[in-house]
Amino acid sequence: MEPVAYRFCPSCGGRLETRLLKATEPERPVCTACGHVVYLDPKVAVGTIIRASDDQLVLVRRAIEPGYGLWVFPGGYVDQGEEITSAAIREAREESGLEIRIDGLVNIYSYGGRSPIIIVYRATALGGELCGDDECL
């Protein structure tokens, strides 16, 4: 996914231009009017590898891009101000219909040139009925 090209300053609305501020850092958008530096922060996403009561893993089939039609474990973006584990529990409930318990951290993943940092948890299904939402086939 290509990064978004920002053209205007979020502080004053002035024109942005790309500048090299430090030799050891990437070029950054800087406002020509007020000097505000725009830092393009990564998004944080969570995923849960859920063990069901019959020792099977829970997967959902994506109904949206990217990855339409692919089988994945439940996950999604963390909302601003939301605790990471709360986001993992919410995404699991929304995408699978299951209430879960977070059992531990699997790993944290990031890939060069891509925005999301993905935090993956191990979880156990506690209840609910397996069903998908509008993001799942």
Residues of each region from the PLM?
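Short connector loops at helix/strand junctions that flank enzyme active sites
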Residues: 26, 41-45, 66-68, 73, ...
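Residue-level signal for pocket-adjacent positions within structured domains
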Residues: 33, 66-68, 73, 104, ...
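Conserved beta-strand segments that form the floor/walls of ligand-binding pockets within enzyme
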Residues: 30, 45, 58-59, 72, ...
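Conserved Nudix-box catalytic region and its N-terminal flanking loop in Nudix hydrolases
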Residues: 51-94
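Acidic, metal-coordinating catalytic segment for phosphate/diphosphate chemistry
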Residues: 2-48
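Unchanged
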Residues: 78-137
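A sequence-level detector of short linear motifs
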Residues: 39, 58-59, 132
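Nudix hydrolase/Nudix homology domain
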Residues: 1-5, 17, 66-68, 112, ...
